[in-house]
Amino acid sequence: MANSNPFVPPSAVDVDLSAVAWGASRTMSDFETGMWRMEEAQPQLRSPIVAVEVLDRAPDWDRLLDAVEWASHVVPRIRMRAVEPAMQLGNPVWSVDPEFDIGYHLRRVRLPAPADFDHALRMCRHLATEPFDKARPPWSALLIEGLDDGRAVFVVKTHHSITDGMGGIQMMTLLHSRRPDPTPNKPDRTPPAPEHLSSVGAFGEEVVSEIRRAPSRIAKLVRGATNVAATAISSPFSTASEVLGYANSLRKIVTPPARSGSPLLHDRGLGRWFGTLEVGVPELKAGAKAAGGSLNDAYVAALLGGFHRYHEAFGQSVESIPMGMPISMRT
């Protein structure tokens, strides 16, 4: 169960600020750009990171505002919007929003009585399905108060282009302290200065960035080709096998699945439904061990089992469902 008032900017003892360096890149990576632009062509593929926390009671609103404001100093990406280069010639560039307003991104609502956790989940669903305003930093948070048992719900929605799941965990860690009382002399940083970057300016930055990266990319390519050639001479069959392996992996990524997948999910709309199922970690680990798998295996199996029951309820039968699995590339 959560602390009664966990939103206290932590001290240096609580968290290592160097652990949240994921917002340092000025330009989106190719993967992040794909996530950013994909939903324009296929809105059904929107997949924001949504974290829902159940709190013992509602935190002090002013302290929550201060905590999120502090986090925006420590992680400047929180204050940044994505600027598309002219005609999308290149990847979007992160730029400090000159009109950044913490009150726009962080809001609160009190549910009318009577209100239980299911009512709060409905509010979370609405937040999760609202498209981001791409002229602003792509994240939002909502404090939901008024539950009958005195609890509160805090939900945070972040676009995948900002960070991955691990980065989201680091972000939530920043907002939580190990003590209920305010922390004096907490580490802080000066917030980044506002920027007025246009699409033409973003394109210019992309061009300059590509020119600067060109020598290192060419050198890396030459070194890689030399290493491959040397390996091929000493072990030609091993090298050929590795090349074929990479080619097959690439083919699997870029080629659509041969199976049609789920007829129910294929024509899904933009709506979402939120529900919860509480399973203890010890029980999940025991089930995984009994089946000869890992904890992650058990989690994925439970999800697929839920999809199986969902299809059965609608009289549909599917043998397999294509799915994507995010993999952390952090070291």
Predicted regions and their residues:
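Soluble acyl-CoA-dependent acyltransferase catalytic core bearing the H(X)4D motif
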Residues: 2-33, 41, 48-331
